[in-house]
């Protein structure tokens, strides 16, 4: 009987110990689950925070990119306006330079034309006497030198006799009509004309004064 009682007591103690161990294991498992749950929650929160930070960073970069694009467009517009203004300035400057140059050339050359006209009249003397012949020949040589100097400065003398009348470079002082004329034609030159020519730039310094023949009306 005593052995049976001891055996039952032992079994009861083992059962209690087993139950205690089972409770301990369950408690540890519960703690572990709680820890895992907390870690999972922290990981989720950290991931969400990183995602939010990345989204904010992306928005900031996009905003900076948009601002940079706007600045580039503004600079392009500004450059285009500046370029257009510069081209207009160059065009105005070129036109002003041409105008100033024309006036300067006219002013300079006009001072020589009357003396040249006088020398031409002397050089055109018909049948000069033996005494005047050397003088007339000397004047002709001086005139050739004058013409050469003027041509080096792009100033050209023109005598349009026999050419079609051009009102832009000639001035008709008199005229006559005849069946022999199919168009207005220069038949006599009272005074030679002069023009300035440099590359494609050409303008009249003094129109030629002429007599023209015209078809009968």
Curated annotation (Swiss-Prot):
Protein keywords: Chaperone, Cytoplasm, Stress response
A Pfam short name: GrpE
Residue spans of biased composition, Basic and acidic residues class: 10-32
GO molecular function: adenyl-nucleotide exchange factor activity; protein homodimerization activity; protein-folding chaperone binding; unfolded protein binding
GO cellular component, one term: cytoplasm
Chief location bin: cytoplasm
Residue span of region Disordered: 1-63
Skewed-composition ranges (Low complexity): 37-63
NCBIfam families from the UniProt entry: PRK14146.1 (NF010744)
Subunit structure: Homodimer.
HAMAP family hit by this protein: GrpE (MF_01151)
Protein name per Swiss-Prot or TrEMBL: Protein GrpE
Organism: Leptospira borgpetersenii serovar Hardjo-bovis (strain JB197)
Gene from which this protein is expressed: grpE
């Amino acid at each position: 009987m005593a052995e049976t009682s001891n055996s039952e007591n032992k079994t009861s103690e083992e059962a209690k110990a087993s139950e205690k161990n089972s409770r301990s294991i369950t408690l540890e498992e519960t703690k572990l689950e709680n820890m895992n749950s907390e870690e999972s929650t922290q990981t989720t929160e950290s991931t969400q925070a990183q995602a939010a930070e990345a989204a904010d960073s992306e928005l900031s970069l996009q905003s900076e990119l948009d601002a940079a694009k706007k600045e580039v467009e503004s600079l392009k517009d500004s450059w285009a306006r500046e370029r257009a203004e510069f081209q207009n300035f160059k065009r105005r400057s070129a036109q002003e330079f041409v105008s100033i140059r024309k006036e300067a050339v006219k002013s300079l050359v006009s001072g020589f034309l009357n003396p040249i006209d006088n020398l031409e009249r002397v050089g055109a003397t018909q049948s000069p006497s033996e005494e005047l012949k050397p003088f007339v020949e000397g004047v002709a040589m001086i005139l050739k030198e004058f013409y050469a100097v003027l041509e080096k400065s792009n100033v050209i003398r023109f005598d349009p006799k026999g050419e079609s009348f051009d009102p832009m470079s000639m001035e008709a002082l008199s005229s006559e009509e005849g069946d022999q004329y199919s168009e207005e034609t220069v038949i006599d030159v009272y005074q030679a004309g002069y023009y300035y020519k440099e590359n494609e730039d050409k303008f009249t310094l003094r129109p030629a004064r002429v007599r023209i023949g015209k078809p009968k009306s």
